[in-house]
């Protein structure tokens, strides 16, 4: 039972996709400023302001 749990947990963690975020060179101060940038560049409205720059995911 424990082996099944560990295997399931490992598969879940590996499927998260750590490299999904796409950094941009657009400066920001709030995450809402990244939504139009991400929409125009990548076609997705998911974004956040990280260290003063927009990251789209």
Curated annotation (Swiss-Prot):
UniProt keyword Signal present: yes
Entry comment, domain topic: Has the CSalpha/beta fold, which comprises one or two short alpha helices connected to anti-parallel beta-sheets stabilized by three or four disulfide bonds.
Site (Crucial for Kv11/ERG channel binding): 41
Phylogenetic placement of the source organism: Eukaryota, Metazoa, Ecdysozoa, Arthropoda, Chelicerata
Tissue: Expressed by the venom gland.
Major site of localization recorded for this protein: secreted
Record-annotated site: Crucial for Kv11/ERG channel binding, plugs its side chain into the channel selectivity filter: 39
Variant or mutagenesis effect after changing residue 44 to A: 14.6-fold decrease in affinity to Kv11/ERG potassium channels
Protein name: Potassium channel toxin gamma-KTx 2.1
InterPro entries recorded: Scorpion_toxin-like_sf, Scorpion_toxinS_K_inh
Role this protein plays: Blocks human and/or rat Kv11.1/KCNH2/ERG1, Kv11.2/KCNH6/ERG2 and Kv11.3/KCNH7/ERG3 by binding to channel outer vestibule (S5P domain) with a 1:1 stoichiometry. Inhibition data are the following: hERG1 (reversible, Kd=7.7 nM, IC(50)=3.3 nM, IC(50)=11.9 nM), rERG1 (reversible, Kd=19 nM), hERG2 (reversible, Kd=77 nM), rERG2 (irreversible, Kd=4.2 nM), hERG3 (reversible, Kd=11.5 nM) and rERG3 (reversible, Kd=747 nM) potassium channels. Also has a minimal effect on rat ELK1/KCNH4 potassium channels (9% inhibition at 100 nM).
Subcellular location(s) of the protein: Secreted
Keywords: Disulfide bond, Ion channel impairing toxin, Neurotoxin, Potassium channel impairing toxin, Secreted, Signal, Toxin, Voltage-gated potassium channel impairing toxin
């Amino acid at each position: 039972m424990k082996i099944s749990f560990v295997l399931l947990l490992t598969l879940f963690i590996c499927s998260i996709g750590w490299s999904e975020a796409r950094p941009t060179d657009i400066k920001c101060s709030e995450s809402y400023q990244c939504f139009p940038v991400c929409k125009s560049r990548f076609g997705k409205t998911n974004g956040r302001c990280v260290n003063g720059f927009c990251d789209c995911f």
